[in-house]
């Protein structure tokens, strides 16, 4: 088969997958509502059909806005499913507002909730099957794309290796093209940049990933200009991986493309989702633990003289000072420029306080901090101001922890990095996990951390 025919077949297969996705989404939505009505003993009425159509239209509009029906090849399934459920949730919320005007509101609301839950499962399962099916086809030579890397950046090599290690993605690596250096060429070398242009013109390559240094701007511009005379897709790998980037993404500022190196993941819709998550969880948890809070408050009051609640100054989001609430666990309270970290068998800790610290129950009042907006359920744990000033000079990127709100529990704590940080290495590991959390943030990641906290995050021998 000629290269041109391979290219056309790849485009046809990609379009076919997109059509299958759209058709399956529509089918699952209507089938889900019909099934819920059947199980509930209700007729599938004209009103159900009308609202389902409106929901579908909204879902398709959101799909266009978020570019949902693009190719998800090479993108993690969790990312695709998160956007799928986000669009579906917003669509159902919109249609539920229409149902609110119905006379039999309670019954219709139950139907809508059941439809939402059933269809959510169906959409995710169907997308998983499509991914598996597409992967099988690509493993057998269908829907393949021939790709090449231009340049010798490490990021380009990493991308090439990932394509080779994941054949189900359907990317077949032609090789690496760059002008040879005095040290010779690697085994992956397929030719110089001029050879790349000739191969692209001959239809041997579908995608070209440019992985060249920032200082090679003139060469990059020349190569892009030459590739404009071909039909291959040209993608640029930004030379930003020399930096320890934090939640980078492509943005536009007054028509100028920019790539943030250090930024917060909590902007726009993500910020609203995170705040909604905090308010709902904190409210439910406070209602559930209110008897426990009263018992702990009484125990603290009887254990030693002093207030029940201790308010500590900590750095919040963007490094702004906040007051963090805790049950008092010590006979003395330190909140000065110099803070002595609690150690094992610390004489300042009361007997009740020792139990509270080991079980993290002393931190329960921080759910009030969450409601007031100073903290989050999940995030990097807040450190003493004195420790912040100390470690920001010793650990690169330490202050990047403050690109999100501090949390009651966090990814570092789940992985065992809590309690006394008596060595620099321990603090470095804690910061490493905190920054990993910020890079990988999602609502589902938060839920995972909350779930793990219930089983392994509260009691820890390192806490005293």
Swiss-Prot record:
Pathway: Exopolysaccharide biosynthesis; colanic acid biosynthesis
Parts of the chain on the Periplasmic side: 37-38, 102-104, 300-464
Swiss-Prot/TrEMBL keywords: Cell inner membrane, Cell membrane, Exopolysaccharide synthesis, Glycosyltransferase, Lipopolysaccharide biosynthesis, Membrane, Transferase, Transmembrane, Transmembrane helix
Membrane topology: Multi-pass membrane protein
UniProt GO BP: colanic acid biosynthetic process; lipopolysaccharide biosynthetic process
EC supergroup of this enzyme: transferase
GO cellular component, one term: plasma membrane
UniProt EC number: 2.7.8.31
Catalytic activity field: di-trans,octa-cis-undecaprenyl phosphate + UDP-alpha-D-glucose = alpha-D-glucosyl di-trans,octa-cis-undecaprenyl diphosphate + UMP
Membrane-spanning residues: 16-36, 39-59, 81-101, 105-125, 279-299
Compartments, record wording: Cell inner membrane
Effect of loss of the gene: Cells lacking this gene show a non-mucoid phenotype.
A Gene Ontology molecular function term of the record: glycosyltransferase activity
Keyword Aminoacyl-tRNA synthetase carried by entry: no
Cytoplasmic-facing ranges: 1-15, 60-80, 126-278
Keyword Protease: no
Miscellaneous comment text of the record: Complements holdfast synthesis in the C.crescentus mutant lacking hfsE, pssY and pssZ genes. Can also partially complement the O-antigen defect in the S.typhimurium wbaP deletion strain.
Chain's role: Is the initiating enzyme for colanic acid (CA) synthesis. Catalyzes the transfer of the glucose-1-phosphate moiety from UDP-Glc onto the carrier lipid undecaprenyl phosphate (C55-P), forming a phosphoanhydride bond yielding to glucosyl-pyrophosphoryl-undecaprenol (Glc-PP-C55). Also possesses a weak galactose-1-P transferase activity.
Family label: Belongs to the bacterial sugar transferase family.
Protein name per its UniProtKB record: UDP-glucose:undecaprenyl-phosphate glucose-1-phosphate transferase
Species assigned in the record: Escherichia coli (strain K12)
